[in-house]
Amino acid sequence: MNTVRQKQTVKPNYAFVDAQNLHLGAKEAGLELDYRRFRVYLKEKYRVGKAYLFIGFMPANRDLYEDLQENGFILKFKPVIVPNDGRKPKGDVDADVAFSIMRYYKEYDKAVIVTSDGDFDTVVKYLNKKDKLAAVISPNRAKCSALLKIAAKDKMQYLEDLYGKVSKRKAMQGENEKAPPGDETQGSAFS
């Protein structure tokens, strides 16, 4: 009896990155993130084949977007709303991130979610229950939602713990931190 064994293909893991949360969280933690090294880390540590980065679109930041794409991120843009009342520009991506996590659910083995936002606790609980969560990486331990920590359980990781692997340097307290390339405008693409 001839039995043909089909070669099992292992699905890649996918990363879903809340860019504003990552940028501001790293900055507040005193870290200057190296996006190229961060993308390599995601690939080597978590077998991330596709890394979706959700970001507000501002035409002035085209160079930044090109750099991020060259570093291996797949950009998912959200229009940025610029209020007339002096508030910072805003490009809310939370719903887009959660939707994409579920949209691509059958394509990936496990998800890596990069955020500190408690709004993701429901999707993180669900992924954990279904054994589809590789990790939640919080950009800032001090600002990480307690709900997110509870939902992620033992799969919680903090950007500060990756110092030297994914950050160029640790900014000194009070030191002016240089904005990412193309992010010198009043509003940031990460807003």
Predicted features, each with a name:
Residues 1-191:
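Terminal and domain-boundary accessory regions
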